[in-house]
Amino acid sequence: MELEYESKRPLYIPYAGPILLEFPLLNKGSAFTEEERADFNLAGLLPEAVETIEEQAERAWRQYQEFKHDIEKHVYLRNIQDTNETLFYRLLDGHLNEMMPIIYTPTVGEACEHFSDIYRRARGLFISYPNRANIDDMLQNATKQNVKVIVVTDGERILGLGDQGIGGMGIPIGKLALYTACGGISPAYTLPVVLDVGTNNPQRLNDPLYMGWRHPRITDDEYYAFVDEFIQAVKRRWPNVLLQFEDFAQKNATPLLNRYRDEICSFNDDIQGTAAVAIGSLIAASRAAGTQLRDQTVAFLGAGSAGCGIAEQIIAQMKSEGLSEEEARARVFMVDRFGLLTDKLPNLLDFQSKLVQKSELLADWDCNSDAISLLEVVRNAKPTIMIGVSGQPGLFTEEIIREMYKHCARPIVMPLSNPTSRVEARPEDIIRWTEGSALVATGSPFSPVHYQDKVFPIAQCNNSYIFPGIGLGVLASGANRITDGMLMAASRALADCSPLANNGEGALLPDLSDIQQVSKRIALDVGKAAQLQGVAVVTSADALQKAIDHNFWQPQYRSYKRTSF
């Protein structure tokens, strides 16, 4: 159980002068008091005025508004993060709706593509394959000693943009910023990591400014041995850390998750986090439509690790609502670039083979039996839910959506691919094609849709609703693993926060301005599930709630006292 975070207790600091001003976790800038300026040899290094954090945030907000392009805003915010982290999070706290798309999706995708061009200052760890013999030393070199949450990527599948090499570091940095801004996890406890195993992206290899290892990606046994060296080193350095895998390629994501989820407290946000927020959204949407998830039929476009992860969680939820395994699987249809997954298709991946439809059940379908398209699935299976995780734009066509609407009065349509340029259909089109009847959730942010004098808020099915609460719940409860039951608890807690399901109006998911309260609610249910499943010490619900509240970091300056090294 984590100890209370006492914001009133002074920090004893050994640093002084310019060194203190260069330490982003400790720097207060113009907010250092007169006493602190004298004690820490800061006289003459700062303007005369002593400011509050609110005054600093107001100046930063005005400066932010001067930038016209999102990537410029991203670079500006990252610069604040790298100079004064408390101010950075205070600024986010006041403008989260505006700034979340800037620090994370969709703008972070552009930042990853141009990582080597916009690079300013080191953050996190760059662990390269040529330096694999020194991984233990690298972890010792981390600027933060008490690391409790690591987000790691190898940069191979960055959003819908593919292989970005070490440019993928933008994702762990952005993800951990949301762990703090949304989940209250102190930035002193977080560490972004990129595993530099080369890149197969010719644009990166041929870029004279590319800062990563200029080499084709290592693969197979060589790759897995390197990842294992990293995992074992992490276990030696921080044995109780929460490790999140992020944006690994489909061929590696599931094997790595399966290999390490019972060895270290870990999860894969692309597979499990995406599934958890999707399930929460679907439970809420089903309630809003007056049904249960067990009553729905689901069609997927995209049968990669993320899509199949969502599908498996849908099946688990349907089973919890009373369906048998066979009945639940018969209600889920997976379509990829080769068509509907059936038991006749060769060369399926292990996680895909569990989700095939039996050919004999499709015998009376009116379709091309060799490659059954999404449109043919919609005509024959008559899905009530359609989920896009294909990474390809525009594939939810007007014909497909209108065909779905013919047999479903309240279709649930979730084009989840991101960034925005990769979305399967735009919400305004889906609303128009269904005459305002569809319930829509997207993976990227979209403005509300105006249709026939009505305003339709568009829920962003954003993993940020889930993973900060999971992280907070793990830290507060002291859980040593993340179980399927904990993930399902997170989904149900999110559904319970749905304005549309609870009030019959509003958005499918809570407003981002409420995300800290949502994270606390999810953390409580995740912590309870961890205790029930034997991966955390059992305490009372009241004690768990107090641990969550006490561990929820706030961006406020603490007083400093001088000490020696």
From Swiss-Prot:
GO terms for cellular component: cytosol. Its EC number is 1.1.1.38. Divalent metal cations. Prefers magnesium or manganese. It comes from the Bacteria. GO terms for biological process: malate metabolic process. PROSITE patterns: MALIC_ENZYMES. A divalent metal cation binds at residues 246-247, 270. Pfam families: malic, Malic_M. The keyword NAD applies. Keywords: Metal-binding, NAD, Oxidoreductase. CDD domains: NAD_bind_1_malic_enz. It catalyses: (S)-malate + NAD(+) = pyruvate + CO2 + NADH; oxaloacetate + H(+) = pyruvate + CO2. The active site is at 104 (proton donor), 175 (proton acceptor). NAD(+) binds at residues 157, 270, 418. NCBIfam families: PRK13529.1. This is NAD-dependent malic enzyme.
